[in-house]
Amino acid sequence: MATISAKLVKELREKTGAGMMDCKKALTETDGDIDKAIDYLREKGIAKAAKKADRIAAEGLVHVETKGNDAVIVEINSETDFVARNAGFQELVKEIANQVLDTKAETVEALMETTLPNGKSVDERIKEAISTIGEKLSVRRFAIRTKTDNDAFGAYLHMGGRIGVLTVVEGSTDEEAARDVAMHIAAINPKYVSSEQVSEEEINHEREVLKQQALNEGKPENIVEKMVEGRLRKYLQEICAVDQDFVKNPDVTVEAFLKTKGGKLVDFVRYEVGEGMEKREENFADEVKGQMK
């Protein structure tokens, strides 16, 4: 049997919101497999589906820059929130975003080797900023998107760049509508544009979890299938942007809202600073000790 560490229990708690003892039991029952433990908790009705990359720790900024039919969303990390609010750091983030658009670099590694207008490489510029600011800084990721003259980009930054979203709306040049949808995505955090992007494997997995959940609730087998399909539709609505109730007008879906503008959401990228990165250890040992008293 696998040893269940306090760190593993903590990770499961952060992903599911379930209690410490429930998480420990789930990990014990699944031999320390965190993905199976999440399913175990959900089947028992203890936890909801874990959100994608919901462990937020690192500081920094997300920025969106557009130039004609090209746009980029970039995340650059710092060690503290104080530096993220620094005007010099904010200028650096914009400078790097523009460099991505100018060079069309495909990877962070390739970007670091490109030359800025002043003759220095991006790598040298970052090191220079580290020396000036006094903190470790790093370009974490970026994504470039393109459109035609008949389409629109939507750019939205939340909390000064803590969350950033870039949307691509096809068939409409209404940038305000595209931005409104970007705001919706920042708030609701869907995983996909539409259900067409959800893999059959994920749907089958979710269907099985929902089936076990219904059976564990004591529902008769003859109605379980109907219940599962209903809950599956709700699940898809929760993770697919176009099927969600639009945050600025819950009477219509995102798809219906854009249809009134003659447009259709075809792509989006949502970055949240530090998502998926390790959290700092904060009093978890004290919490464990408290449970043992």
Swiss-Prot record:
Q: Where is this region: Involved in Mg(2+) ion dislocation from EF-Tu?
A: 80-83
Specify the superkingdom: Bacteria
**Keywords attached to this entry:** Cytoplasm, Elongation factor, Protein biosynthesis
Localization recorded for this chain is: Cytoplasm
Keyword Protein biosynthesis listed: yes
**InterPro entries listed in its UniProt record:** EF-Ts_dimer_sf (IPR036402), Transl_elong_EFTs/EF1B (IPR001816), Transl_elong_EFTs/EF1B_dimer (IPR014039), Transl_elong_Ts_CS (IPR018101), UBA-like_sf (IPR009060)
- Give the GO molecular function terms: translation elongation factor activity
Question: Looking at the UniProt record for this protein, which Gene Ontology cellular component terms does it annotate, in alphabetical order?
Answer: cytoplasm
Protein purpose:
Associates with the EF-Tu.GDP complex and induces the exchange of GDP to GTP. It remains bound to the aminoacyl-tRNA.EF-Tu.GTP complex up to the GTP hydrolysis stage on the ribosome.
Family assignment? Belongs to the EF-Ts family.
Q: What is this protein called?
A: Elongation factor Ts
* The species this protein was found in: Staphylococcus aureus (strain Newman)
Question: What gene name is given for the protein in this entry?
Answer: tsf
